[in-house]
């Protein structure tokens, strides 16, 4: 008897036919679309099968073939070797008496401070009632639906100054995020676990947290704040710097100073954390020249020199104090063309050891009363740079995974180790990279801390602040000939860092503050957890 002609069986038959064709011919993207149209029509489907629908019918042995790379959506999501999962904390009040003049949202609006309710991450948070477990689980499920296999997760905690929230809430929030990764793909009933239990489970989980990003104000990144963030598992801390002009900071009611920025940067860096800056060109009182000088000074002045950078041109949003100034004619924001000109000029001076992660906030244009409304500002800036024959030297523009997504030929690279040394915050930084033809395959950040470092674990030791191998994310325990992960390149960089720490600086120990999901990686390479500490240490004396 013939099988029932249901939509499901039609879809499965069509998907299997397409998979069999792909297994035998491996066409390009254009040919794939033709095949999908032809088979979908022949099987009587009302619509053309989508890539993720075909992926549902892949067999286990087919999951490791080139078919997955052809069908997976949004390859840029994992091109840097990891997946990001952004989660939003519940709305809470600004930690100071009055929000900054440009800052929208807040408890009275039902959103975290500085958010509008229309940002994708916030909308996911609202839909989940700000439940961290559900936010992480839903995001991982979204990735899987698109054909991805999320295994290494950089958790990004958004929603304002996280260290200013209730301490018990901070611990509960991070614990539940980790538990979602530990339980995935199965939603499980709530069960109380301590932070330490959740971290221990994640060391061997299918989905591992390789790092946690937290946002804070400079005056909420003192030594005791930093210690709390480290205990929670933070590996990258993003600071709302905005500008390096104290008068402008006072004018917008920022409530902190440039001195706070310098101190926070040093404390975080000395503790082994990565440091990111948020900068806001176009603030009231700042000129184009002053904005450009800020974007140059954060790299020329050794008191700053962040590892990561996000640039958010100032926007006028209804309901803010700045909106009232704009209505009264006392303020005008940077327009699209002005912002592009400024950013193109700034890109000329970005060093090779910074990653420019974003240059625009994710805000719908219809909400913006004045300011940059182009949603593709980064693409416009990149196109202008190419037209001028300028290649940005930042990490993001050179990393091999994104180069492959852009269609550049990276098939025959023979990366070599390069070392760049620079002073920062009273200590010494070494950017140890694997490069070829200016393509960046991976890097390691090694620090010799300043004399003011407060964490006992780092005193007298070299500190590995970051180790990253680029290219498509390869799940834990697997290998791919087409990718750079899991081929010993990380171990090569580690060995070089240990050699430099020992031979160049005479250090006898090297420590690292790894994400909880990466502890096993370092353990295999001779690192051991220090007693009652999240740090891992290896002796390197001859």
Regions found by a protein language model. Name each.
Residues 99, 355, 463:
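The −1 position to Zn-ligating cysteines in a subset of zinc-ribbon hairpins
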Residues 500-514:
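Conserved GNAT acetyl-CoA-binding A-motif
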Residues 480-500:
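Conserved acetyl-CoA-binding loop-helix of GNAT-fold acetyltransferases
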Residues 514-538:
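Conserved active-site alpha-helix within GNAT-family acetyltransferase domains
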Residues 1-135, 139-188, 352:
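Flexible, acidic/Gly-rich N-terminal and inter-domain linker regions that tether
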Residues 330-445, 451:
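C-terminal accessory regions of radical SAM enzymes
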Residues 118-135, 155-276, 280-337, 341, ...:
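Conserved non-cysteine loop/helix-boundary elements of the Radical SAM core domain that shape
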Residues 458-485:
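Conserved acetyl-CoA binding element of GNAT-fold acetyltransferases
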């Amino acid at each position: 008897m013939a099988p029932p002609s249901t939509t499901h069986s039609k879809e499965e038959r069509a998907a299997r036919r397409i998979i069999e064709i792909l297994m035998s011919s491996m066409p390009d993207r254009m040919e794939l679309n033709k095949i999908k149209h032809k088979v979908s029509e022949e099987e009587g489907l009302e619509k053309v099968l989508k890539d993720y629908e075909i992926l549902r019918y892949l067999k286990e042995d087919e999951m490791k073939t080139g078919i997955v790379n052809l069908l997976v959506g949004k390859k840029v999501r994992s091109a840097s070797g990891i997946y990001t999962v952004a989660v939003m904390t519940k709305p809470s009040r600004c930690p100071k008496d009055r929000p900054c003049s440009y800052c929208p949202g807040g408890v009275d609006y039902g959103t975290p401070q500085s958010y509008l309710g229309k940002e994708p991450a916030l909308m996911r948070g609202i839909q989940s009632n700000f439940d961290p477990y559900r936010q992480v689980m839903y995001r991982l499920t979204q990735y899987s639906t698109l054909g991805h296999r999320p295994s290494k997760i950089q958790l990004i905690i958004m929603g304002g100054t996280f260290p200013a929230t209730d301490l018990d809430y901070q611990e509960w929030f991070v614990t539940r995020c980790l538990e979602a990764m530990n339980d995935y793909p199965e939603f499980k009933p709530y069960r109380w676990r301590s932070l330490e239990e959740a971290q221990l489970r994640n060391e061997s989980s299918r989905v591992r947290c390789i790092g946690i990003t937290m946002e804070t104000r400079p005056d909420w990144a003192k030594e005791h704040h930093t210690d709390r963030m480290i205990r929670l598992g933070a590996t990258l801390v993003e600071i709302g710097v905005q500008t390096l002009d104290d008068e402008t900071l006072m004018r917008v009611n920022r409530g902190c100073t440039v001195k706070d920025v310098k101190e926070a940067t040093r404390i975080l860096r000395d503790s082994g954390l990565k440091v990111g800056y948020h900068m806001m060109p176009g603030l009231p009182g700042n000129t184009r020249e002053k904005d450009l000088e800020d974007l140059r000074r954060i790299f020329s002045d050794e008191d700053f020199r962040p590892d990561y950078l996000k640039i958010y041109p100032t926007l006028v949003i209804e309901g803010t104090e700045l909106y009232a100034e704009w209505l009264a004619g006392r303020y005008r924001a940077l327009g699209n063309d002005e912002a592009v000109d400024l950013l193109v000029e700034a890109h000329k001076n970005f060093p090779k050891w910074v990653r420019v992660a974003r240059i625009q906030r994710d805000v719908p244009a219809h909400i913006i009363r004045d300011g940059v409304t182009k949603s593709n500002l980064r693409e416009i800036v990149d196109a202008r740079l190419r037209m001028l024959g300028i290649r940005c030297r930042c990490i993001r523009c050179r990393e091999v995974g994104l180069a492959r997504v852009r269609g550049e030929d990276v098939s025959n690279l023979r990366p070599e180790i390069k070392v760049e040394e620079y002073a920062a915050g009273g200590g010494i930084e070494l950017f140890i990279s694997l490069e070829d033809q200016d393509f960046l395959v991976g890097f390691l950040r090694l620090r010799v801390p300043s004399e003011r470092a407060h964490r006992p674990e780092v005193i007298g030791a070299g500190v590995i602040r970051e180790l990253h191998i680029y290219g498509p994310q390869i799940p834990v325990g697997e290998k791919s000939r087409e990718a750079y992960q899991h081929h010993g390149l990380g171990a090569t960089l580690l060995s070089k860092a240990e050699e430099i720490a020992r031979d160049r600086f005479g250090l006898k120990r090297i420590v690292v503050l790894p994400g909880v999901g990466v502890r096993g990686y370092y353990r295999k390479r001779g690192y051991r957890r220090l007693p009652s500490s999240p740090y891992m240490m290896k002796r390197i004396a001859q």
